[in-house]
């Protein structure tokens, strides 16, 4: 037999086709295959490399390559098996020699066996070296997959390549790994996207307590429910993870990662402070890179790796733009390719495998880029929007665009752009011109296929992932998201399918969350809409089958397009990865609870990294440039005004109910902790983790004798079956403040209370904290919470039952425990209150004791079952009624007749417990409110039942202070809360009926007086009718006798020439001012007024004309009307060049309505316009006084009309309101006499055309365009009447349409700016 040679040089290549089968039962291939099969059996998720037996690699579900460390026993077993294979081959070789000597085996066969023996020798040698290195280094490095040659890469690593593409310029690159020692810092291959941590940095995501249970999207508790989450952060963009479980909210303070399946857990905060708003954030849409999130930071682009710790989560920082980045989009086929666009008109394509420079760039050279999107079908096509143009680019075509789509003839801005998922050449655009256009650039780039025209500019428009439709999001004027069916655009046009209403401010982003994508032959996907609004709320909207069917969704057909999210592992990145060395997997349940650190605890440990800034994409070693305070990137220290504590986070979550679930009972552990956290203000929640079902609370509890307090810290662990069958585990920390006997008493009492709550399937934390806070004794808790309704059915008394449940224990508090500490830590509730509404109604509530009749009525109602109560959410509307559909079951006094339809007072009484005395509650009706009709007059705001689909329209029960009723209470108390709505119309001088029919202006003032006299007589106000008739005759006489050509233009009021007219006007104004009748004062101001007079000096500003009056004239008039600042007064001069300083008077405190505490007119103030003596010899002096008198009276007229216009707005009379405000617009001077001034918000002074106030030296804000709402720099167009300003281009665009809407001012003030004098000013 030949000597076995271990040198590789002695090896010969085996023959390719002259292999003779060996008769031995064990050959080389069989032994090696057996070794591989055993390795596969022991490690089913691992792969064995036959070329290198000491190397293994692991493939997870997402296609990523994971690390796998060889254990000692694995190496020993491998060496033993290899030795066995070698021995078998040696025996085979001996047999081969014998056969060769007998000339039965050929020479070639012997050489083949020798080569195989050499291979076995080499295999054992490599395994022994690996084991020796493993023992010497004491597991100092991680052994990972190692590919030596390109051939081995293709053979062994084909399955773990990034992805494969069809002839794309962004082809896949094979991943190479280095088996050499890894340093202590985090290292990565420049050509790889796989992080290779060292042994001491074995990172993993923290799992929940039930990590051994497979959790999927169909196990989600929030997918089928409406959910509202309040996030008090300046969030600029939102994105969704590939699996649909997490959302990323990007703000100026960093990145928030929120788990939608565990919304009660505070989000993970990756801090990065920046002074710039985040324009966009995008989660990687591919399953292979589900840990990547990209966001903008001015001209930079940040790529976050959520699989890394928070202090090193920034993996890449892309810097290629010179202006702010406006949009980003991941490639739809390649997970490593990203496209970004910027205001600098450039579009960059980045390959994150070499992120130093963009791999491709496109430029428009004229307009900045606002949107960029990759094609869903073609991996080489992408589109970008520049102004009103859409450029279609091909990365194989060069720098010139493939197609250019001109979306509009006018100057506009494209806000949204998206390709169709099913057709390669179709896309849609939405723009500021209030249109949504559908394009097919293969057919035409000039005319769209279809067009949708809306009432307001469209901020975003996208195709729906189901059916054939679009979903639109307005930019302003509407806080809803609209869904349209687009199947019959040619014949019927778009059909509105649904309106998602509920946000109170503009919606900024919407996303689609789906599940059920793993079925290929049918489309069984479920959908949920996620929206983010400027009201700081994330809301989830389930999509029902009725909406899917109305959009043409067919579940029997397969999905018509490729799903990039398919195969994504359903996991969350809402928790920071923890190092393996910090996790103790062998601790028991109590130790695990004590050693558990919440997400906020981990965040506090990283607060030192707030100002660290970015770290280079590949160079992660620490240097002086990475130290706090020495960052080379722009950061800003911020201080949150509302710290996001766990309790504050819980308060902002509202989850819908399924079916007829009770709103007074928490539906899960998160709601229970949220409710009790708001009810008990003296309890401090140190740690809350709903996912791990633990919390830690502390408080000063009155558990010591003689009313003594002791500090208590309580750890609570809630099992999964709580509160159905499992009791929470309490761990009370011992303290020197109380002895062991007192400690045992408190602990046993808490356990007994929780056991009794669980026996009734009730939540127990409310009862436990009521006992610890001293609000209720154990006896009271038992009587209120666990006493049966039918008490006489048992022979035992409640005291006997209590003694059986709670054995005799010493009372360590001393005194009467039921009285000494009851409610001592809770402030007294408000038992009565009253407030005026804007519709002439007074709403008040108060508490009364129940009499016998009321008690009888309560008993009658209890026969029908206790009604569920919830707090009304809206403002009282006079047109709505809250009469229950089953009102026959109740007394007549329980119906609420609104004062808007009747002059009589209305009253509502309902039985609630005493702790709810500060809330206004109403019984639920049997009908629900449609989301589309929530603002209509037919929708009943109060007394309507909100189901699971209507939680955004309602508020859950009051949760402030102690107003929440105890969860334990099942019996109504003996107090009644009365809510009364009183109509005050007969006590107020202003009359709504008159305002509805009064005529403000018809051109002839005599006709106005006669018509108003008829209206007053019609409603039986005969005194007012006489006043109007008298005033009409007086003005008619003046118009006949006075020659208008001889009237001095500076005398604004022609009735000044008549002593009788002056006396009559003076008497009327004096009388109605004393009566506080703003209605008559405003109407008289309209009738007695004429267009504004000419000014004496062309250089005098509008403010000087109105308010620079001689002091003696003001004193002679003898009245100062202190009008409160109303909304109308603020809106009169909005977007104007000249601000009226007199109208910006101080706002009174607590002026919540028109009739506030500070009266519109002082009771002692009178308007006495003293007559002037025209017999004086100095006529010039008299004329000067008349001019001053006229200007001061104009000021009063403006204030009266503005106040009355505010009242008309509250009544809903918008046309008379605009007619009233037009008179105020006429009071300004003509455009030729205007000078450009700014108004300082700090000192209320007017300045010249400068940015710095000349009086207080504060920054004066620039004027904004009424069309695009952007600040104005340079030339602008100024209207001579309403004083609104617009950019020159915006002015041309607005008035170029030629429709009826664009003929008036773009601000909506009603001014016909196009036909008035327009002036060109420079700002």
UniProtKB/Swiss-Prot annotation:
**Lyase listed as a keyword:** no
Q: Which family does it belong to?
A: Belongs to the WD repeat WDR59 family.
* WD repeat ranges per the UniProt record: 271-314, 320-360, 364-403, 409-449, 453-494, 502-551
Residue ranges constituting the RWD domain according to the UniProt record = 671-779
MF annotations from Gene Ontology: signaling adaptor activity; ubiquitin protein ligase activity; zinc ion binding
Among its keywords, does the record have Disulfide bond? no
Q: Which residues carry this modification: Phosphoserine?
A: 24
User: Which is one Pfam family of this protein?
Assistant: WD40
- CDD domains (UniProt xref): mRING-H2-C3H3C2_Mio-like
InterPro entries recorded = RWD_dom (IPR006575), WD40/YVTN_repeat-like_dom_sf (IPR015943), WD40_repeat_dom_sf (IPR036322), WD40_rpt (IPR001680), WDR59-like (IPR049567), WDR59_RTC1-like_RING_Znf (IPR049566)
The organism is Schizosaccharomyces pombe (strain 972 / ATCC 24843)
Q: What does this protein do?
A: May be involved in telomere capping.
Ranges of Polar residues compositional bias?
42-57, 80-105, 879-888
Region of interest called Disordered, as start-end residue ranges on this chain: 1-57, 79-112, 879-904
Protein name (Swiss-Prot/TrEMBL): Uncharacterized RWD, RING finger and WD repeat-containing protein C11E3.05
Keywords, A to Z, come to: Metal-binding, Phosphoprotein, Repeat, WD repeat, Zinc, Zinc-finger
Tell me which GO cellular component terms the UniProt record holds.
Answer: fungal-type vacuole membrane; GATOR1 complex; GATOR2 complex; Seh1-associated complex; vacuolar membrane
What PROSITE patterns does the database record attribute to this sequence? RWD, WD_REPEATS_2, WD_REPEATS_REGION
Composition bias type Basic and acidic residues, residue spans: 1-11, 27-40
**In residue numbers, where are the RING-type zinc fingers?**
1265-1309
Bias kind Low complexity: ranges: 12-21
Q: Which GO terms describe its biological process?
A: cellular response to amino acid starvation; negative regulation of TORC1 signaling; positive regulation of TORC1 signaling
């Amino acid at each position: 037999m030949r000597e076995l040679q271990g040198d590789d040089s002695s090896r010969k290549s085996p023959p390719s086709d002259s292999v003779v089968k060996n008769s031995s039962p064990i050959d080389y291939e069989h032994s090696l295959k057996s070794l591989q099969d055993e390795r596969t059996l022991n490690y089913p998720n691992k792969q064995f490399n036959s070329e290198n037996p000491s190397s293994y690699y692991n493939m997870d579900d997402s296609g990523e390559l994971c690390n796998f460390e060889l254990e000692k026993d694995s190496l020993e077993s491998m060496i033993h098996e290899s030795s066995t294979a070698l021995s078998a081959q040696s025996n085979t070789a001996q047999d081969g020699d014998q056969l060769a000597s007998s000339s039965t085996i050929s020479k070639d066969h012997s050489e083949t066996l020798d080569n195989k023996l050499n291979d076995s020798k080499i295999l054992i040698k490599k395994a022994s070296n690996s084991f020796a290195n493993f023992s010497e280094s004491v597991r100092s490095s991680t052994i990972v997959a190692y590919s030596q040659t390109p051939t081995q890469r293709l053979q062994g690593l084909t399955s773990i390549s990034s992805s494969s593409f069809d002839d794309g310029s962004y082809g896949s690159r094979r991943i190479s790994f280095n088996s050499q020692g890894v340093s202590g810092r985090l290292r990565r291959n420049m050509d790889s996207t796989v992080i290779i941590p060292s042994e001491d940095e074995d990172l993993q995501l923290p799992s929940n307590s039930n990590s051994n249970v497979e959790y999927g999207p169909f196990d989600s508790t929030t997918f089928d429910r409406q959910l509202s989450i309040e996030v008090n952060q300046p969030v600029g963009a939102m994105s969704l993870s590939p699996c649909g479980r997490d959302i990323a909210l990007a703000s100026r303070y960093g990145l928030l990662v929120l788990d939608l399946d565990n919304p009660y857990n505070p989000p993970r905060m990756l801090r990065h402070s920046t002074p710039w708003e985040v324009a966009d954030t995008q989660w990687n849409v591919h399953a292979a890179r589900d840990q990547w999130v990209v966001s903008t930071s001015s001209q930079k682009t940040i790529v976050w790796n959520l699989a890394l710790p928070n202090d090193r989560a920034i993996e890449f920082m892309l810097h290629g733009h010179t202006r702010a980045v406006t949009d980003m989009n991941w490639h739809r086929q390649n997970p490593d390719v990203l496209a970004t666009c910027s205001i600098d008109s450039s579009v960059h394509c980045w390959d994150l495998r070499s992120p130093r420079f963009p791999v491709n760039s496109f430029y428009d050279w004229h307009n900045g880029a606002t949107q960029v999107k990759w094609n869903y079908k073609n991996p080489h096509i992408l589109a970008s929007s520049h102004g009103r143009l859409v450029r279609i680019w091909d990365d194989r075509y060069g720098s010139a665009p493939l197609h250019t789509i001109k979306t509009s003839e006018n100057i506009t801005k494209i806000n949204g752009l998206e390709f169709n998922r099913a057709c390669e050449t179709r896309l849609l655009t939405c723009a500021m011109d209030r249109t949504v256009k559908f394009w097919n650039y293969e057919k035409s780039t000039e005319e769209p296929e279809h067009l949708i025209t809306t009432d307001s500019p469209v901020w975003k428009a996208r195709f729906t992932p189901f059916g054939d439709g679009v979903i639109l999001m307005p930019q302003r004027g509407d806080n809803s998201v609209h869904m349209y069916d687009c199947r019959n655009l040619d014949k019927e046009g778009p059909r509105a399918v649904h309106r998602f209403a509920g946000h109170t401010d503009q919606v900024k982003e919407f996303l689609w969350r789906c599940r059920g994508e793993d079925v290929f032959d049918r489309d069984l996907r479920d959908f949920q809409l996620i929206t983010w609004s400027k009201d700081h709320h994330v809301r989830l909207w389930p999509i029902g089958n009725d909406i899917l069917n109305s959009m043409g969704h067919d579940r029997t057909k397969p999905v018509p397009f490729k799903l990039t999210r398919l195969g994504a592992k359903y996991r969350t990145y809402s928790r920071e990865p923890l190092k393996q060395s910090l996790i103790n997997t062998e601790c028991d349940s109590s130790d695990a609870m004590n050693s558990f650190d919440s997400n906020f605890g981990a965040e506090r440990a990283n607060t030192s990294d707030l100002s660290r800034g970015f770290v280079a994409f590949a160079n992660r070693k620490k240097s002086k440039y990475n130290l706090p305070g020495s960052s080379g990137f722009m950061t800003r220290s911020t201080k949150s005004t509302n710290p996001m504590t766990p309790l504050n986070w819980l308060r902002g979550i509202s989850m819908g109910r399924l079916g007829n679930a009770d709103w007074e009972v928490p539906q899960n552990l998160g709601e229970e902790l949220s409710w009790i956290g708001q009810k008990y203000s003296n309890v401090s929640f140190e740690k809350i983790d709903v996912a791990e079902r633990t919390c830690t609370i502390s408080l000063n509890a009155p558990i010591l004798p003689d009313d003594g307090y002791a500090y208590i810290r309580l750890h609570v662990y809630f099992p999964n079956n709580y509160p159905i069958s499992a009791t929470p585990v309490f761990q009370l920390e011992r303290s020197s403040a109380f002895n062991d006997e007192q400690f045992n008493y408190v602990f046993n009492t808490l356990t007994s209370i929780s056991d009794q709550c669980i026996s009734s399937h009730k939540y127990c934390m409310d009862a436990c904290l009521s006992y610890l806070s001293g609000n209720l004794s154990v006896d009271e808790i038992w009587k209120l919470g666990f006493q049966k309704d039918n008490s006489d059915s048992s022979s035992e008394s409640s005291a006997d039952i209590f003694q059986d449940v709670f054995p005799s224990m010493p009372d360590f508090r001393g005194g009467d425990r039921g009285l000494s500490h009851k409610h001592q830590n809770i402030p007294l509730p408000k038992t009565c209150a009253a407030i005026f509404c804007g519709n002439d109604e007074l709403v008040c509530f108060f508490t009364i004791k129940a009499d016998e009749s009321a008690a009888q009525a309560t008993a009658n109602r209890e026969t029908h079952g206790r009604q569920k109560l919830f707090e009304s959410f809206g403002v009282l509307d006079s047109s709505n009624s809250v009469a229950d559909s089953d009102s026959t079951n109740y007394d007549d006094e329980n119906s609420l007749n609104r004062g808007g339809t009747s002059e009589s007072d209305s009253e509502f009484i309902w039985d609630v417990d005493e702790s709810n005395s500060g809330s206004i509650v109403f019984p639920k009706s049997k009908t629900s409110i449609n989301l589309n009709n929530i603002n209509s007059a037919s929708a009943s705001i109060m007394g309507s039942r909100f189901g699971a689909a209507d939680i955004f329209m309602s508020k859950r029960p009051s949760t402030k202070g102690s107003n929440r009723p105890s969860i334990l209470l099942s019996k109504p108390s003996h107090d009644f809360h009365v809510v009364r709505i009183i109509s005050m119309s007969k006590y107020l001088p202003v009359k709504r009926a008159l305002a509805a029919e009064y005529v403000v202006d018809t051109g002839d003032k005599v006709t106005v007086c006669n018509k108003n006299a008829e209206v007053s007589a019609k409603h039986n106000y005969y005194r007012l009718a006489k006043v109007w008739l008298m005033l009409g005759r007086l003005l008619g006489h003046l118009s006949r006798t006075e020659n208008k050509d001889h009237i001095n233009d500076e005398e604004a009021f022609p009735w000044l020439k008549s002593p009788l007219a002056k006396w009559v006007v003076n008497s009327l104004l004096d009388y109605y001012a004393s009566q506080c009748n703003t209605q008559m004062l405003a109407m008289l101001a309209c009738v007695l007024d004429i267009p504004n007079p000419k000014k004496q000096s062309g250089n005098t500003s509008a403010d000087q004309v109105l308010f620079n009056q001689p002091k003696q004239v003001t004193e002679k008039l003898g009245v100062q009307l202190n009008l409160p600042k109303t909304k109308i007064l603020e809106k009169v001069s909005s977007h104007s060049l000249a601000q009226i300083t007199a109208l910006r008077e101080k706002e009174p405190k607590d002026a919540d309505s028109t009739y506030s505490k500070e009266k519109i007119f002082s009771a002692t103030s009178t308007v006495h316009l003293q007559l002037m003596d025209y017999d004086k010899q100095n006529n010039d002096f008299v004329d000067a006084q008349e001019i001053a008198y006229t200007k001061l009276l104009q000021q009063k007229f403006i204030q009266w009309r503005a106040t009355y216009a505010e009242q008309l707005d509250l009544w809903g009379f918008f046309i008379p309101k605009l007619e009233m405000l037009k008179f105020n617009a006429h009071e300004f001077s003509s455009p030729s006499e205007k000078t450009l001034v700014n108004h300082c918000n700090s000192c209320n002074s007017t300045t010249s055309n400068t940015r710095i106030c000349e009086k207080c030296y504060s920054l004066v804000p620039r004027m904004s365009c009424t069309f695009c709402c952007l600040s104005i720099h340079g030339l602008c167009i100024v209207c001579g009447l309403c004083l609104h300003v617009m950019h020159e281009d915006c002015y041309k665009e607005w008035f170029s349409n030629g429709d009826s809407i664009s003929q008036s001012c773009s601000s909506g003030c009603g001014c016909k700016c196009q036909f008035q004098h327009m002036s060109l000013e420079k700002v």
